[in-house]
Amino acid sequence: MENNKYFKQFVDRLDVNQNALDTLKENEITTLGQLSKYKKTQLKDMGLLQNEINKIEVELELLGLTLKGSL
């Protein structure tokens, strides 16, 4: 997956709300590659809402990336 051309791009490129982006950055997740190493449950523990996690997951899939443990 690390060969994906989006792996080193910033999470800001995701079409998600500002609250979700702020939460990711507060947890020092700044790149899509870093984000893809997290599980949904870990994102929820950071304070992200389920609908925000679902949106993040869809956005990653559109770029050929997934969250850890996702198919």
Describe each model-derived feature in a short phrase.
Residues 1-71:
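Compact, charge-rich alpha-helical regulatory domains located at protein termini
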